[in-house]
């Protein structure tokens, strides 16, 4: 195993908070493999790169010689995590949870080493608890303490309903750590309350309390809101190689470094060198391409990563003009100096009519020189652009 200092440096990379870092150091000093737990409720069929922030950290623990427990919350998934919610979540059926759980297993082993991973389901122990056991578990915490949670506090004072089963969720998640005898538990910053519950319950059951590591919530493609399928700003683990590559090229330049730290396995010294190169004038797209190739290769293989940039849209994002792109010369007879993007799309036959132009612009599917534009974008007379409308229509356009 690496030294404690080397291990700690990798473990702390990108971490938001470690609760009882001294305890982690003591555990590492024993020189024995630790049991590292992270739980995922299978509430949707596919994972996105935001989920992989935790999974990447699990892989780093594996590389340091530790045992990872990838916990699928099939039982808690049917309760519904109330964290950050302003209303009670609708419960999932057993069939939904089982189907989603299967896809999770298929996706996570693109990152985790199967030989160092225990895949567990919390129904293994929760289904065996009697009503009396659940009441005893509920007796370990008070309603007053539960209402200290920010989301519960807001709902209570906003006179919005809170179901009793939602109070049980953090207790069940905490009990998972008891059942698994976890040494370390990982979670997002929004999970801190639930993670602390695990420490409290382990102490109650005379176990050494787990160390808690919280990881940041990854921003989505807009660089502002958290990555979320419902917000449409996500990169799915199962996205096609070209689509994944293109989305990664489209992130804001300043967000690239956050993605490198949380999603890349490159050494931080190398990433710092990339920053120096960009500050010295290197095109950020060239560095972003390295990030995109690494992540696409992780999920689709090296060959797919090498060819992913060859789609026309991705080449434009990289500042390249794809082969065999039609060239369109637009000669305007009036004295206008600028033209709406909707007008240019129609004139260049990239759309059939004004309604089609409105539709494709409304869907955010128009790109000028690789950058997404909205309906207000104007094209200047005398300019030259590569314009893409939707997935298939693209042209190099000269406006005279």
Curated annotation (Swiss-Prot):
It comes from the Bacteria. Transmembrane segments: none annotated. A motif ('KMSKS' region) lies at residues 226-230. InterPro entries: aa-tRNA-synth_I_CS, aa-tRNA-synth_Ic, Rossmann-like_a/b/a_fold, S4_RNA-bd_sf, Tyr-tRNA-ligase, Tyr-tRNA-ligase_bac-type, Tyr-tRNA-ligase_bac_2. Keywords: Aminoacyl-tRNA synthetase, ATP-binding, Cytoplasm, Ligase, Nucleotide-binding, Protein biosynthesis, RNA-binding. One of its GO terms (biological process) is tyrosyl-tRNA aminoacylation. GO terms for cellular component: cytosol. It catalyses: tRNA(Tyr) + L-tyrosine + ATP = L-tyrosyl-tRNA(Tyr) + AMP + diphosphate + H(+). ATP binds at residue 229. Gene3D superfamilies: HUPs, RNA-binding S4 domain, Tyrosyl-Transfer RNA Synthetase. HAMAP family: Tyr_tRNA_synth_type2 (MF_02007). Homodimer. This is Tyrosine--tRNA ligase. It comes from Hahella chejuensis (strain KCTC 2396).
């Amino acid at each position: 195993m690496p030294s404690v200092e080397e291990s700690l440096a990798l473990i702390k990379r990108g971490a938001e908070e470690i609760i009882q870092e001294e305890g982690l150091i003591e555990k590492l000093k024993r020189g024995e493999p630790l049991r590292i737990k992270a739980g995922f409720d299978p509430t949707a069929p596919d994972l996105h790169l935001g989920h992989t922030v935790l999974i990447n950290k699990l892989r780093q623990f594996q590389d340091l010689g530790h045992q990872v427990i990838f916990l699928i919350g099939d039982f808690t998934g049917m309760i519904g995590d109330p964290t950050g919610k302003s209303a009670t979540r609708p419960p999932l059926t057993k069939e939904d949870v089982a189907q989603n759980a299967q896809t999770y297993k298929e996706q996570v082993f693109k990152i985790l080493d199967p030989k160092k991973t225990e895949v567990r389901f919390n129904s293994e122990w929760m289904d065996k608890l009697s009503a009396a056991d659940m009441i005893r578990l509920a007796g370990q915490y008070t309603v007053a303490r539960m209402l200290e949670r920010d989301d519960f506090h807001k709902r209570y004072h906003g006179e919005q309903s809170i179901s009793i089963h939602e109070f049980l969720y953090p207790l069940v998640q905490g009990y998972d750590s008891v059942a698994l005898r976890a040494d370390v538990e990982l979670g997002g910053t929004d999970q801190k309350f639930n993670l602390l519950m695990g420490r409290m319950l382990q102490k109650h059951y005379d176990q050494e309390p787990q160390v808690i590591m919280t990881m940041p919530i990854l921003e989505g493609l807009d660089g502002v809101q958290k990555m979320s399928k419902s917000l449409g700003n996500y990169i799915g683990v199962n996205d096609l190689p070209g689509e994944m590559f293109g989305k990664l090229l489209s992130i804001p330049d300043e967000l690239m470094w956050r993605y490198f730290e949380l999603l890349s396995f490159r050494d931080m010294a190398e990433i710092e060198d990339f920053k120096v190169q960009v500050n010295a004038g290197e095109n950020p797209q060239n560095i972003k391409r390295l990030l995109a190739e690494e992540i696409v290769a992780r999920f689709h293989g090296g060959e797919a990563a090498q060819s992913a940039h060859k789609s026309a849209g991705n080449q434009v994002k990289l500042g390249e003009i794809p082969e065999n792109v039609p060239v369109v010369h637009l000669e305007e007879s009036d004295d206008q100096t600028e033209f709406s993007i909707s007008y240019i799309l129609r004139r260049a036959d990239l759309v059939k009519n004004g309604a089609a132009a409105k539709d494709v612009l409304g869907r955010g599917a128009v790109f000028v020189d690789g950058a997404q534009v909205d309906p207000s974008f104007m094209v200047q007379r005398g300019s030259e652009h590569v314009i893409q409308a939707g997935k298939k229509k693209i042209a190099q356009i000269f406006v005279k």
